[in-house]
């Protein structure tokens, strides 16, 4: 989508509606309220804290991980990881506090609802029925209600109701509803709310009560496009029957608020606020890069809901701001090593807008530099990377003159995900430079929603400041790679080593050894939690580490006996007892860093290396080391229309002796080139399957078929696959197929003609081998000729 057109349309819309609507890419917009891709929000206020539970979007089809966003002011949000759910899909979470004092967490997978329980709204959670994926509501638990999108409602008498449903548009279908028993494990009453009461009901029910009226709200249309919208019906009973009242939220005129829906409602005093998701700008393919927004609801005197006018402004703060310093980066002059295109300019990193971001052109080390105009004191820098649920590695430097640079924060070994990433220091500087150096996943690069620079110490974000495992010991330092503060424990005296003991890797401090971690923000007088695990008397025990904390330092010392320790943690907030107990028995997860050591040419096969009529049981790979071996029947080399070619007759299948390199995992850029001739092209024929996994978006499969949706390249993604509608016309002709993907856009060429170009996202997993002649599942046999095949683990645009 062209952003210039969108801005002009936004301005015209504001004039037409009589108020000054901010353009979606203006500085300081209040919507989206979260920097990242999230959907299906449930917002709750427990105590003085707002909690935002949502589907993790932008990761395929809601594949997690589990998380919650928290805020004290409804403007500055912090991402906090949760232990559960740990399932493949984590969709549409909802949390409620029961009269028993516990919190209940409902979420769904297709097509079932699960329920967890915890003593805190952050967890740790456990399935109320025992096993992690035990099902509370199976599919069609209520006849003709497809189970999805569970949402609770608590009535004035304390009764708890659950509503659920999707694809409720069919005749006789609708939304499931049930009154939960006091144990929250069963229902005392159920009913189908049919689509004759809730017109066009598709999914995402939400029920609230106001002045004796029950409002049954829901989403209609397709969540992938502009038709998604919110409608509602009313009743005088929580289970209905309901009377349809109309649509209250839909795509705006200029399309910058696109496909709004799957909402929840926050009541604050006498005000009601609708929190919903909408598609990103510019709109991503598939519609699974959604963002969270909020707007005020209004009611007419008769109790009907007035149609919402969705805004880019949002509602602002609902409490005093936790941030006390001015954002020095806002509107600063900025330059960068590169930017993807005009939709992702460097200026978008300093506009305090959660809907715009700077995206560098490449996936390697890229930088962005801010000029504050004059030298200013800097004590805190917040960085909100594109994906807060995965870790980034980076370096922040400062300079007075733009020539001589000093390190402000070195996170080049960081393995902690979070948003914002918070770095502290104390320096006077005019220039600030952020350099992305790597991270958890390939193909995501160092894109940034916002960079915020503060003169004061801004430490309000509740985070894990220290997180250390035995693997973080490098022989001289114990590096804080899983903690927000970075840095390291330094060896002051003695010696330490890594040892496997009691089923865990541990750091052993020999007698007389002292390690010290220094940071000015550490203090026993400030709210905190510090803990670890130590091995004593033949078992692992909680380490009450409070005594090791002093003003500005943590000191670990072993006296006459070794100190065997791991999982050392420090939080800048006070954990509840359940959270402490969970940490006492749970290891810190230390995820690997994505492999960025490119190989270049990974696969290279050519029939020109053989003589016509050769029988070829082995194909030497001239890319990375290795070969392809026939499983049964070997190929024969033929001469076809001026080219030597391997003749596949549907029975030949080859597998590689090597794995797909890790540099091609996740969303990594790649380039694929092949010469193929097929006399009789079937619907789906697999030339080469480069992956052994078989889940959504995990495939890189070269296909030669007539299927217009996926007949050229198949990723197991309905929107991401690509075909060619005129493929039948190429039967009996040589096809030069060239596919290149830069981590965002994939171009597909056949004989030099661009047949597909769209933004996609891949989730390629480790693959044990590459398959020729069929896919890894043994289907889609290829019956044709292959002259050559090449695969690179880098983006190489097609040259004219």
Put a short name on every predicted segment.
Residues 287-291, 439-448, 558-567, 747-749, ...:
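Extracellular carbohydrate recognition
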Residues 351-461, 572:
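Aromatic, loop-rich ligand-recognition surfaces of beta-strand-rich domains
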Residues 546-563, 758-785:
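Flexible glycan-contacting loops in extracellular carbohydrate-active proteins
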Residues 465, 474-481, 490, 500-502, ...:
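Extracellular glycan-recognition modules
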Residues 302-305, 311-351, 361-362, 386-397, ...:
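Juxtadomain low-complexity/linker regions and immediately adjacent membrane-anchoring helices
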Residues 297, 381, 396, 451-453, ...:
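Extracellular beta-strand elements of beta-rich domains used
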Residues 518-519, 711-736:
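Short, aromatic/His-centered strand-loop micro-motif at the edge of beta-sheets
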Residues 21-199, 209-255, 270-271, 277-321, ...:
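Beta-rich carbohydrate-recognition and catalytic domains
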